[in-house]
Amino acid sequence: MAISDSSYNELAKQVYNVEPSKAKSNGDLVIVAGKTVKDPITKRQYRVLLVQDNNNDAHKTNDNGMQAMAVAPIVKGDIDTSQVVIAYAGTNAADSRDLDTDWQLLIRGNQDDLVSGNIDGGNFVIAENQLRSAQKFYQQVKRKYPHSALTTTGHSLGAYLALIVAAE
């Protein structure tokens, strides 16, 4: 069964809830692997297979603000990993790393590492850019589910990441 436009849209909305503070501000539960998310229009359910939240990663080099999740539809009670959707979160205006990514990656076209903070004052962090993190997450999903048809979705910055990753 094909994944509907409304499901892609809902997954692109739900991926923001991978980040705990965003889930809290949305009044939702944090999305973790094993959770089920639902498209309210089609009533189709999806099992969350993998998540990545680079806002809460222990490795500072990953601290770039990228969030993503991989889901598979639940068909007749079974998880159908023949098709997996990777959803990327878009810009969170309250997250300076997302705003820095928008500036560096989308506006300036700079695909080098992400530089966040006060560069002139010497108080800055260099982290992998979100596009590289998105590509790595895609490869991780592809390795774990090698026989799956992978598709991507996202809004805003997440749509950019989804389009570039899918085009590669």
Put a short name on every predicted segment.
Residues 153-158, 162:
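Gly/Ala-rich beta-loop-alpha elbow adjacent to hydrolase catalytic centers
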